[in-house]
């Protein structure tokens, strides 16, 4: 179980530096900050096998751990006000990956894609949360739920949270 927790910590570190390929986890192998937290970064192939076993429950566990890490970072910062930016991005795929579909894809018109929705804290330059959606998903879909989840996980009496989104997120629910 310690190995699996180490893989999760490795993935969180990858999220925080914005990796786009598991191969880039190697950039963390000799990082002093990663070593300070006693995280042994495994080979990308090992992490890939680990991720292949994920289901909804383990994905939710990963999200919960990420919120705990972000909350610790936020607490250490002693900020009393933060801005959370919510946005989406299209990830082009080749072939017929599960969940990918044709949608708004400016990179390759007509190709199947995923539509990733994510939230970052502007002041800390840190990833807060996010999830993968089908390529044909409307920009604002899931944003209200994401805002509720963020507030439920990080809100405190001495913290003011401002959410910032572009006009694609205009929706009565938000």
Residue ranges and their predicted role:
Residues 48-118:
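Active-site-proximal, Lys/Arg-enriched surface segment
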Residues 17-30:
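Short, charged amphipathic recognition helices of the HTH superfamily
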Residues 38, 131-142, 162-169:
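Alpha-helix capping and helix-loop boundary segments enriched in small/acidic/polar residues
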Residues 10-11, 25, 43, 47, ...:
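Short, conserved catalytic/metal-binding motifs centered on acidic residues
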Residues 106-156:
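Electropositive, glycine- and tryptophan-enriched low-complexity nucleic-acid-binding patches
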Residues 30-49:
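Short, basic interhelical loop/turn and adjoining N-cap
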Residues 1-9, 141:
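Basic, short loop/linker segments at the boundary and entry of helix-turn-helix/winged-helix-like folds
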